[in-house]
């Protein structure tokens, strides 16, 4: 439990690093790999919108670049009550999350909700469908 609260605290701390001059909506994501490594990401907006990088894909891409593929926690926090991943991020998470990966949507260390990728993206298309 302390480990989870520390991850939530970290996400809240880095949220202001987001580059969001157009929406003014700051999102942060902290992921913990099964090996215990922690990676961070924030949303980075772009004037043409489509190249905007969401916090979730930012954090996961950094971890993947460092050779990590298995995740214990994906913690997301934003400027609203509870900030859920967009559809693109849910599909991106689907590629690397398994049924044991906890996806935490947090307002603060006391107010958060825990999900699996199957909760957030039921009936999804995944790499298993291509086997």
Language-model segments: which ranges?
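Short, well-ordered amphipathic alpha-helical segments that serve as non-catalytic structural scaffolds
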Residues: 10-13, 55-62
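Alpha-helix C-terminal capping segments
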Residues: 32, 62-68, 96
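Histidine- and/or cysteine-centered catalytic micro-motif in compact active-site loops
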Residues: 32-34, 43-44
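Compact, glycine-rich, soluble single-domain proteins
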Residues: 43-57
């Amino acid at each position: 439990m302390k480990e989870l609260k520390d991850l939530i605290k970290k996400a809240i701390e880095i949220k202001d690093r987001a580059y969001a001059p157009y929406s003014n909506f700051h999102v942060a994501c902290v992921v913990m790999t099964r090996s215990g490594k922690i990676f961070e990401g924030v949303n980075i907006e772009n004037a043409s919108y489509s190249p905007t990088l969401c916090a979730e894909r930012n954090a996961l891409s950094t971890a993947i670049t460092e050779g990590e593929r298995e995740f214990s926690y994906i913690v997301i926090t934003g400027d609203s009550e509870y900030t859920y991943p967009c559809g693109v991020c849910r599909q991106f998470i689907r590629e690397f999350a398994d049924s044991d990966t906890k996806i935490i949507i947090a307002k603060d260390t006391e107010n958060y909700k825990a999900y699996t990728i199957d909760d957030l993206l039921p009936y999804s298309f995944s790499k298993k469908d291509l086997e």
